[in-house]
Structures are given as C-alpha cells and as structure tokens.
A protein has these predicted regions:
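N-terminal capping segment at the start of a domain
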Residues: 1-23, 38, 132-145, 209, ...
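Noncatalytic luminal/extracellular "stalk/propeptide" segments of secretory-pathway proteins
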Residues: 8-98
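Second-shell loop/turn segments in exported
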Residues: 14-22, 41, 102-106, 151-153, ...
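Alpha-helical metal-binding/catalytic segments enriched in His/Glu/Asp
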Residues: 35-36, 106-107, 117, 126, ...
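Soluble metallo-hydrolase cores and metallopeptidase-like ectodomains found primarily
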Residues: 62-67, 71-85, 89-91, 139-217, ...
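Structural recognition of the beta-strand scaffold that forms the well-ordered cores
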Residues: 102-103, 123-126, 157, 191, ...
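Metal-dependent peptidase/peptidase-like ectodomains
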Residues: 199, 248-346
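His/Asp/Glu-rich mid-to-C-terminal helical/loop segments that flank catalytic regions of hydrolases
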Residues: 232, 344-408
Length: 408
C-alpha cells in the first residue's frame, strides 16, 4: 500500500470511536468503503454489546467537588462513606475496605473488583493520567459485565492530580452520585474474504475501536491499515490458503469483537490454521515484537525469518492482550505483531495517541515483514504450525481469561 493512502486512512479516522458508539459504526462503514475502493468486498457483522449513557456523575470529598467521570454500567444511586486509600492486597490492607469508598491505584480488573466486593467496600474511585502532564483529562471507564457479574458498586474515575491532592490532604469522607441509562446496542466486525485453493483459512485480525480519549492512531488504526494493506497485496498475489481479514469492534472493551466472532463462527474454527493479529505497529520508535500463542517452533521460525530478511524482531511465547487470544483459547495457533514503543514514546489510551507518533515509512517496513511471513504460511503445502495449544499456553490463557488467578 502506498504511504499516501496509509496516511489518508489515519487522517480520515482521527476521532474517538468507542465500542458500540455511532462513531465506531462510522469507522466500520469507512473501512468497508476503503476496501471497496481497493476492489475488495467487505461486509459488516453485528454483535450485541452492553451500553450506557451517564446523565450525572458527582464526586464530593470532604465537601469539595472533584471533577470525575462515572463508571459506565456501574448502576445508579448515591453513597456517602469514609474514604480509604488501598495500596496492597494483603488481608490487613483489604480489611480496611469495609463500609468505605475505596480509592485505589491501577485498573479495575476482575480480581481487584472481587476484593472490593468481598471485603465490604461500598463504592470506589480510580484515577488515570500523569501528574507531570499539563492536561487534566479523565478517561471514561466502565464496569465490565464479566467483572461485575451482576454485583454493582458505584464508582468514578478522576485525574491523577486530584488523586494526589486527596491523599495528600488526608481526606476523610467521600460521596458519589451516579445516574445513568443502561441499554443494549450493536458493535460490528468488518470482514473481507479472499478464497484460496483450499477452504482452510488463515485469519488476520486488527481492532478499529478506541478508548474514550483517544483517536487510536497507534492503538489500533495502525493494525487496521496493516491488514488492509495485506488484503490489497493478497488480492493480487497467490495464496493457497483462503484468507479472512477481520477488523474487530469493541476490543478495548474486553476483546468483544473477537469473542463474538469465535462464538458466531465456532464450527468454522476447525478449518483455521493460524491467526495473525496486528495491534500497534508503525510508530516512529520502538522494538518490533512477535508474541506467539502456539508452539515454540513458531517463535524460532519468526526469529530466523527476521535474520533472513534483515529485519529486527523479538519473538517470544506468551498470551497477547488483543484479538488473537479468543482464537487461541479455542485451540487455534495465533501470533500477534506489534512495534512496542512504551508510554514515553507513544502513549496509548489517552489524547496523545494521534498520527503524530506514526511514520508511514515504518508502517510500510513493518507491513512488508508481516506480509513476507504471512505469504510463506498462506502458500505452504500445509501450514507448518501445529494445531495444538501447548500446556503452558493453556495455563496462561486460563489466567488471562480469569478462569484462574495468576500466582503472585
């Protein structure tokens, strides 16, 4: 793909597109039209998602109102209680949660939320941002249904600067007022098919949604540009395997698009030889990585290919937090490619994720390497990757998908 078209796609999609929103649907239609302009046929496949519109969110700490955003899908109501700052997960620290509104560090994951519930918290406060940045942005987060499991606590998210002020002032009490409308809607996967000589498939995935503050250029319109470029390439070049390209919706809300696809197409997964996922490529700086959720032979293959083609790549075996994982959980070998820049170079999930961190020449180089790998797989007499998930990857999948708590 020419770099001018790559840049145009980034520019045309430079807006927030959260999962299930009208803006996400607009991006899905744009990807379908872009495919059509390239001579490719694409269609949208809807799946149901939980949605919410917050009508009021107020946090008061010691009588002072703190700017906040209410957690989506966390219910409605109000609660006032003593404030407690939780920094650890040992029994003593957790014992302080009972009857309190709890301020905590980091993300509200499944196990942290279980700890809050089981130890009697009555509400929660999270924070994001950086105390050294000029902005006072606040991410609009959600209490994911698979985290809450029907047990909802009122919660808000605030800026890190205000979190520091709250703790520094030794605040004693907090009050949360949250009113929202919760309902169901649709997100969409966008799918392109290129039939091959065999019905067996290689699937390419990349998510096109973003978080609430982000234009999502690096994370992850870059991956979408990548698989669109590969669809353009393979439409004009041989491939023995049939190829399917899936632009996944609502990844940032918990891999919802790829999970929905694996449910809707479960019977077809037996014919999928490999999943190739792109999530964050083409930024100006950063190391190129390949995370393999499959046998270690594929790790070695990709490392050797990098040496053969003169391309720096760090391949390793693990579970990647992206759309490759639901497929791997169904036993399909998967590999994710990314150029990992880190928060100091290309921060994600905030307003700094824009096309300014991208370089079209680097995009082309990254896509060329992934295409070279994919072409070898797509034209193999038989895809050499074993269709068997190693036991250590099954263990990691159990941990990632919250079936088992990760050992400390």
């Amino acid at each position: 793909m020419k770099k001018e078209l790559m840049k145009k796609i980034f520019d045309d999609t430079a807006y927030v597109r959260t999962g299930g929103s009208d803006a996400e649907k607009r991006a899905a239609e744009y990807l379908r039209q872009t495919a059509s302009d390239l001579g490719l046929e694409a269609h949208l496949e809807p799946f149901e998602v939980e949605l919410a519109t917050v009508e009021e969110a107020v946090l008061t700490v010691d009588g002072r109102e703190i700017p906040c955003k209410g957690y989506l899908l966390a219910g409605s109501g109000e609660v006032e209680a003593p404030l407690y700052y939780l920094t650890e997960s040992d029994r003593y620290s957790l014992s302080g949660c009972k009857g309190k509104i709890v301020l905590f560090d980091g993300y509200l994951g499944y196990w942290r939320y279980r700890e809050l519930l089981e130890n009697g918290a009555v509400g929660f406060i999270s924070y994001d941002g950086n105390v050294n940045y000029a902005d006072r942005d606040i991410d609009h987060r959600e209490l994911r249904p698979h985290v809450a499991k029907g047990e909802k606590l009122l919660g808000v998210n605030i800026n890190a600067k205000d979190a520091v002020d709250i703790v520094n002032s030794e605040a004693k009490t907090a009050k949360i007022v949250l009113k929202q409308r919760e309902y169901k809607g649709n997100s969409h996967n966008v799918i392109i098919d290129l039939p091959g000589e065999t019905p067996e498939q290689i699937i390419f995935t990349a998510h096109y949604d973003s978080t609430s503050l982000s234009q999502g250029a690096y994370d992850n319109m870059s991956g979408c540009v990548g698989i669109m470029a590969m669809a353009e390439y393979f439409a004009k070049n041989p491939h023995r395997y049939s190829l399917r390209f899936i632009f996944c919706g609502s990844e940032e809300r918990g891999l919802l698009g790829s999970k929905a696809y694996c449910i809707q197409h479960e019977a077809e997964l037996k014919d999928v030889a490999l999943v190739i996922n792109l999530d964050m490529i083409g930024c100006i700086m950063g190391k190129f990585i390949s995370c393999v959720t499959a046998e270690t032979a594929l790790v070695n293959y990709i490392s050797y290919l990098g040496s053969e083609l003169g391309f720096q790549v760090k391949a390793y075996q693990d579970v990647y937090s992206s759309d490759s994982t639901p497929f791997a959980d169904k036993g399909v070998p998967a590999v994710s490619f990314a150029r990992a820049a880190g928060r100091d170079l290309a921060p994600i999930h905030n307003s700094y994720d824009t096309v300014a961190v991208m370089k079209m020449e680097q995009m082309q180089k990254d896509v060329d390497f992934i295409t070279a790998f994919a072409s070898r797989m797509a034209n193999a007499a038989i895809c050499p990757v074993a269709k068997e998930m190693p036991d250590n990857m099954k263990e990691k999948l159990d941990e990632y998908l919250l079936r088992k708590k990760k050992k400390a």
